[in-house]
Amino acid sequence: MKILFSPIGNTDPWRNDRDGAMLHIVRHYQPDRVVLFFTESIWQGNQHFSGQQAFDWVKIIQSINENCQIEIKCDTIEVENDFDAYKDLFHQYLVEEKRKYPNAEIFLNVTSGTPQMETTLCLEYVTYPDKMRCIQVSTPLKTSNAKTKYAQADCQEVDLEIVNEEESQQPSRCHKIAILSFREAIVRNQIKSLLDNYDYEAALQLVASQKSFRNGKEIRKKLKELIDDIKMHRVFSYLIKQYPRNEKLQKALLHTILLEMRHQRGDIAETLIRVKSIAEYIVEQYIQKNYPYLIIYKEDKPYFNVSYSQELTESYLALMDSRNKKTNKKMTVDSLDRILGFPAYRDFLQLLEASNEMTNEMNKVNEINNLRNKVAHNLDSLNLDRDKNGRKITNAVTAVRTMLLAVFPEVQENDFHYLKQFNQSIKELL
């Protein structure tokens, strides 16, 4: 089904003994339904011009397409020269047409109305282009309408017969205009906003929805690769090239970048759940680097090497006993044979180094551990206002970066901003 939506300004069904724009579209596209829009003042006219009600618009249209359904809409517009005056009204009418006829193709006549009407329709198309087309009609002489002969209401039947006879063999003066430059400008700004929020999947979908888009193929490829890397936790190729011989650094840096990205885009609960595991991995590398052989691995799981230092073993047992005062349960060397995690690493470093940068940063991560367990294991909701939780999570995220730099001081500051640099590269392609 084809529907023509056509606002009518101070124009006539035909001029210079030839079709007017609306009539020309009807002649060459043969729509099943025509919706004409008039302002009340244009419809009724005044002392300076006769209103459009003087013309039999239904008869005029059906003289070309006798089975066409015609609906005339007439509304009072307070400020007719205001470009915003028609925006909501036109949108409402077009939504109604789409709801009544969901499979219809809607043609928008952007030639017959006032400049304000035509501009509004163009913007409507740019914003909601699905199943719509903008149709522009050239004048018969492909020039301005100055000094042309206009239709007269009192002899419209004679004029209509002449026009139909002359126009029946004439080529179409209709042009489908995509207004791609306007549409692309809006889409580019939308993509930039999505990039700023690190919403790469939505950005990819938006780029992919455009049939013709500058650098579209390259942008889609880059976005798809980044999305796959993030989903699969694959180290970015840039980081591999930057640090080709240090896989542990690559992994730690990747996850620190992703952690900060999630925090910046407001994905706070996910940030809270991930921060401890990333900190744990980084601290494990710190211990391996500064205290070799303190950790031994059984089936790739970390365990405390009780043979590392008798003094450390005794100090660690004493620390565990002090925490078990209520149960009076004494810890033994055999009871230390268990998989290690962040709390144990924190204990070791407090015993080995007392107070230093690493243990101070670990305390910031440990401060949110109970909150993390409630969200991750009890599936509790997150309240950022309670107990300064928002600030504590921010401190923990910042601590992870500081810890990473303590273990891998060769990491460059710019590397933490890799995603912002990636975003900028896409914006330049746009």
Curated annotation (Swiss-Prot):
> How is the protein's activity regulated, according to its record?
Non-specific ssRNase activity is allosterically activated by cyclic hexaadenylate (cA6) binding to its CARF domain. cA6 is a second messenger produced by Cas10 of the ternary Csm effector complex in the presence of a cognate target RNA.
A Gene Ontology annotation in the biological process aspect, one of them, is: defense response to virus
Lineage, top-rank taxon, reads Bacteria
**Keyword tags:** Antiviral defense, Endonuclease, Hydrolase, Nuclease
Hydrolase as UniProt keyword: yes
- What one GO molecular function would you report for this record? endonuclease activity
The family note in this entry says: Belongs to the CRISPR-associated Csm6 family.
Q: What else is known?
A: Encoded in a type III-A CRISPR locus.
Q: What is known of its domains?
A: The N-terminal CRISPR-associated Rossman fold (CARF) probably binds the cA6 effector. ssRNase activity resides in the C-terminal HEPN domain.
Tell me, what does this protein do in biology? CRISPR (clustered regularly interspaced short palindromic repeat) is an adaptive immune system that provides protection against mobile genetic elements (viruses, transposable elements and conjugative plasmids). CRISPR clusters contain spacers, sequences complementary to antecedent mobile elements, and target invading nucleic acids. CRISPR clusters are transcribed and processed into CRISPR RNA (crRNA). A single-strand-specific endoribonuclease (ssRNase). Activity is stimulated by cyclic oligoadenylates (cOA); maximal stimulation is seen with cyclic hexaadenylate (cA6).
Name this protein carries in UniProt: CRISPR system endoribonuclease Csm6
The organism is Enterococcus italicus (strain DSM 15952 / CCUG 50447 / LMG 22039 / TP 1.5)
Q: Which gene encodes it?
A: csm6
